[in-house]
C-alpha cells in the first residue's frame, strides 16, 4: 500500500485531503481532490474506491493503490501527479 497519510498537498492546482488508516477525515469517509479547478471525491466502498465529480461516477477501483495507478487526470495516472508534487517535477 502506498502511504499517502504523510502528504497534505495544497498548491494552486491540486488540493488533497489524504486518507487516514480507517478511511476517515474529520468524521467523513471521503477524500477530496481538487485539480486545476476541478473537484473530485474519492469515496471508499469497503476496500474498493469510487471516484466521482459533480454526481458523475468517474471510476471504480479495487483498492486505493489501483486508483493511484489507474485513474488518470489530464492523461496522467494519479500517482504521477502525486510524484510530481512530492519531488517538485
Where do the model's predicted regions map?
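Mixed-charge, Lys/Arg-enriched low-complexity segments
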Residues: 1-9, 57-89
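Negatively charged, low-complexity tracts enriched in Asp/Glu with abundant Ser/Thr
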Residues: 1-32
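Acidic, low-complexity, intrinsically disordered interaction modules
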Residues: 27-33, 39-67
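Short glycine-rich, low-complexity/disordered patches
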Residues: 25-38, 79-89
Amino acid at each position: 500500500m502506498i502511504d499517502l497519510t504523510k502528504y497534505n498537498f495544497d498548491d494552486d492546482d491540486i488540493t488533497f485531503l489524504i486518507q487516514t488508516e480507517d478511511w476517515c477525515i474529520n468524521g467523513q469517509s471521503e477524500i477530496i481532490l481538487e485539480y486545476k479547478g476541478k473537484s473530485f471525491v474519492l469515496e471508499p466502498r469497503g476496500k474498493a474506491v469510487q471516484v466521482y465529480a459533480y454526481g458523475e461516477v468517474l471510476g471504480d477501483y479495487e483498492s486505493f493503490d489501483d486508483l493511484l495507478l489507474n485513474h488518470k487526470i489530464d492523461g496522467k495516472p494519479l500517482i504521477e501527479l502525486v510524484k510530481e508534487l512530492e519531488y517538485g517535477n
